[in-house]
Regions:
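Structural signature of hydrophobic alpha-helical transmembrane segments
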Residues: 7-21, 74-78, 130-136, 187-202, ...
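Juxtamembrane helix-boundary/capping and inter-helix hinge elements in multi-pass membrane proteins
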Residues: 35, 93-98, 110-111, 144-153, ...
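Juxtamembrane and boundary regions of transmembrane helices in multi-pass small-molecule transporters
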Residues: 167, 171-280, 484-540
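Active-site loops and adjacent core secondary-structure elements that bind or stabilize anionic groups
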Residues: 237-329, 348
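Transmembrane helical segments that form the transport core of multi-pass membrane transport proteins
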Residues: 291-446
Length: 540
């Protein structure tokens, strides 16, 4: 067996800086060199393998196994989810009901500062709570484009909106996982999320309005945006404190915020109606509104997304035990070890690394979306031939972006199995009493590398808890800070960027989306970091 070495250069800070080269390289490739996401991923993977093997001593066979593991996890479940989500969207468009979708949104408000809150913030928050894995980013970005938003701007707004709900995605898995890894009570950690994160959740709608329309937007609809954020965040606080449940934190509050916002819009509209430059003009929208749609037609138009919501919620809750390893349908899950990695690596703490791949054919979220797509085909005017034609178009649209996702996951796995990610975290952990200031940065790095708040918590929740005990800070605070920093990292994680780009048919434009989004991710990270440090001084 090979044991990970976290300080191969006998200088913790220098070793960490070398370990961070892939993260820095990926960002520079996208933002400075303006390379496509695919080229950036290839370059970063090559450099990561060289550093992992030559500097950190990762055996070549383990490096190959890490890449294999990355490709498998990138293809399934992530690639499968993206493929099915985009196919469902294309089926919905091909079915010919999108004029009704647009009209139904415009009937609530023609102001696109509010439309983005309805779709990306509220509806997207609910989808994140039910499914996660980038599904709300893909679906909401595509819906915004259908309303006339610029594709790249729609992607950025969907990514930023996702920061409000990313901590509790897929029925609260990031928090429940963090509690398990850090040996904390789940209800206690859920309550601990409140002071760390929820002031920032409340201001996300304000940020989205400011991005669209600057100070004028804040003056005209800022109060409504803030109220939406407070209801969303306040609902999450209520669920976390009184129910002690992170599982429902992205289910009830987004729907509550959506209903309240729609009710407000039924009684009030801004004097100045904001339209995106690329969207249909107000006159064109009003002309379209002259065509009356019945309630049945509106439900029919939205039915693909209703089916999506129902199926992913069922897959995540009621049906989940059926797909478990010991469940009636567990036989549909094939699990096998990753050669060169499984039980071939020992961590610095002496723990043997297990690395397996589980092909959960029935229980995957992508399969839930497949069911929603099949129901849509059966209940709409689209023929099977047209549906399969759309699938072919979807595959041609996604094959390169899915390859990029596989490469990104390979980078993450090489860094993890080589001990590079842990090297960065351990170096930051030497900051002593200043560590709470850097705690969210570790979560940010974890999500940037892995693309998942859950994975970042698997990697670092234990480190955060241990370091907290050493410096006399409540472990709950730092584990919560790790999660909070992670959701800010999701805004620019290569995996999320790739999903957003492909959803709006802008594959190859990842560098532009990253450049547009990174400043907001950085600002939110700085705010969370300073706030976490202040909390550590106040409550310890």
């Amino acid at each position: 067996m090979w044991q990970q070495v976290y300080d191969p250069l006998n200088a913790p800070v220098l070793s960490a800086l070398v370990a961070a080269i892939p993260v820095i390289l990926f960002l520079l490739s996208l933002t400075v060199l303006k390379l496509s996401g695919l080229k950036s991923a290839i370059l970063t993977l090559v450099v990561t393998l060289v550093i992992g093997c030559a500097v950190f001593g990762l055996p070549i066979v383990a490096g190959a196994g890490s890449v294999l593991s990355g490709f498998l996890s990138g293809a399934w479940p992530i690639g499968w989810i993206v493929l099915m989500a985009v196919w469902l969207y294309r089926i919905a468009v091909r079915a010919g009901n999108f004029d009704t979708v647009r009209a139904s949104v415009s009937s609530i408000t023609e102001d696109q500062r509010i439309q983005v809150l309805l779709i990306a913030f509220c509806f997207g928050g609910f989808i994140e709570g039910a499914a996660g894995f980038g599904i709300p980013i893909a679906i909401c970005a595509a819906l915004l484009v259908s309303l006339g938003f610029n594709p790249l701007k729609a992607s950025m707004l969907a990514l930023i909106a996702n920061a409000a709900s990313g901590a509790y995605g897929a029925i609260g898995i990031p928090v429940t996982t963090a509690a398990k890894v850090a040996n904390l009570d789940t209800a206690h950690l859920s309550a601990g999320m409140v002071p760390v994160l929820h002031i920032f959740v409340a201001i996300v709608p304000l940020l989205m309005v400011a991005i669209q329309d600057g100070l004028r937007g804040i003056r005209e609809v800022g109060l409504v945006a803030l109220l939406t954020g407070v209801i969303f965040s306040g609902g999450q606080v209520g669920v976390l404190l009184f129910l002690g449940s992170s599982e429902l934190a992205d289910i009830i509050p987004p729907l509550l915020a959506l209903v309240v916002l729609a009710l407000i819009m039924s009684k009030w509209q801004p004097k100045h109606i904001y339209r995106e430059p690329t969207a249909p003009t107000l006159e064109e929208v009003k002309a379209q509104q002259g065509i009356k749609h019945s309630a049945g037609e509106i439900v029919k138009a939205w039915s693909p997304f209703i089916y999506l919501s129902v199926t992913i919620l069922l897959w995540s809750t009621a049906l989940k035990p059926l797909f478990a390893a010991n469940g009636p349908l567990g036989v549909a899950t094939l699990t096998f070890p990753i050669p060169g990695v499984h039980e071939a690596i020992v961590t610095g703490a002496g723990k043997t690394v297990t690395a397996t791949f589980s092909w959960n054919t029935l229980g995957a979220s992508g399969t839930a979306i497949l069911v929603a797509a099949l129901i849509t085909i059966l209940t709409s005017k689209i023929s099977w031939a047209e549906a399969f034609e759309e699938f072919g178009g979807t595959w041609n649209q996604l094959k390169m972006p899915i390859l990029m996702i596989c490469l990104v996951m390979s980078v993450a796995n090489v860094m993890n199995y080589a001990g590079m990610t842990t090297s960065i975290a351990l170096a930051l952990a030497t900051a002593g009493s200043l560590f709470p200031l850097l705690s969210p940065v570790i979560g940010w790095i974890g999500v940037f590398v892995t693309g998942s708040v859950t994975n970042a918590n698997v990697l670092f929740a234990g480190l955060q808890s241990t370091t907290a005990a050493q410096i006399g800070v409540d472990p709950t605070l730092l584990v919560a800070a790790n999660t909070a920093g992670g959701v800010m990292g999701k805004i620019v994680s290569p995996q999320s960027i790739a999903i957003a780009a492909v959803a709006v048919n802008s594959a190859g434009e990842e560098s532009k989306i990253t450049s547009m989004s990174i400043k907001y991710s950085a600002i939110l990270l700085v705010l969370v970091s300073v706030w976490s440090y202040a909390l550590s001084l106040m409550v310890g």
